[in-house]
């Protein structure tokens, strides 16, 4: 079992943790999040970005992690970036808690997400269905109020 954790922080009030667990290289990864400080009753883009670099805030994280050269999509789409986690849904206080299993996200192997950055966006991810070029790259998810590097956990 490999475990990883990401502590989300940023210029905004958005903060939280994201944990990852994977039993073996062929197993799906369980991703669990507990995030506060978002707008209430909203959907916010939630992605793994390429670089574990936050020197210039969340912008330094680069584009979505996409080792297979696909277009942006929903987590359940065949054509998607590895880093496309879709949207988190917030409650009436702006908090989001949840968990999902993802067979594209790996902690083990050549396309591991360890050392990369999780970004919570300021807008809703259109899941690549926005009908424009930016939708196929970013899902038009908007600014990056919070992010954190994924690190190996005990």
From Swiss-Prot:
Compositional bias (Basic and acidic residues): 123-136
GO cellular component, one term: cytoplasm
PROSITE patterns referenced in this protein's UniProt entry, alphabetically: SOD_CU_ZN_1, SOD_CU_ZN_2
Disulfide pattern: 58-147
Keyword DNA-binding: no
Cofactor (UniProt): Cu cation; Zn(2+)
Catalytic activity: 2 superoxide + 2 H(+) = H2O2 + O2
Cell location: Cytoplasm
Domain of life the protein comes from: Eukaryota
UniProt cross-references to InterPro entries, sorted A to Z: SOD-like_Cu/Zn_dom_sf, SOD_Cu/Zn_/chaperone, SOD_Cu/Zn_BS, SOD_Cu_Zn_dom
GO molecular function: copper ion binding; superoxide dismutase activity
Keywords attached to this entry: Antioxidant, Copper, Cytoplasm, Disulfide bond, Metal-binding, Oxidoreductase, Zinc
Enzyme class: oxidoreductase
Cofactor descriptive note: Binds 1 copper ion per subunit.
Region ranges (Disordered): 122-143
Assigned EC number: 1.15.1.1
SUPFAM superfamilies in alphabetical order: Cu,Zn superoxide dismutase-like
Known function: Destroys radicals which are normally produced within the cells and which are toxic to biological systems.
Quaternary structure note: Homodimer.
Protein name: Superoxide dismutase [Cu-Zn]
Gene: SOD1
């Amino acid at each position: 079992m490999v475990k990883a954790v990401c502590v989300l922080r940023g210029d905004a009030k958005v903060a939280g943790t994201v944990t990852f667990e994977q039993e073996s290289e062929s197993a799906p990864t369980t991703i669990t999040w507990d995030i506060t400080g978002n707008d209430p009753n909203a959907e916010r883009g939630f992605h793994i970005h390429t670089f574990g670099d936050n020197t210039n805030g969340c912008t330094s994280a680069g584009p979505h992690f996409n080792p297979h050269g696909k277009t942006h999509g929903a987590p359940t789409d065949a054509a998607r970036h590895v880093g496309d986690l879709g949207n988190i849904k917030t409650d009436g206080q702006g908090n989001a808690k949840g968990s999902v299993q993802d067979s594209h996200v790996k902690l083990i192997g050549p396309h591991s997400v360890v050392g990369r950055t999780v970004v919570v966006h300021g807008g809703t991810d259109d899941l690549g269905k926005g009908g424009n070029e930016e939708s196929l790259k970013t899902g038009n998810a908007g600014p990056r109020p919070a992010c954190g590097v994924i690190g190996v956990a005990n």
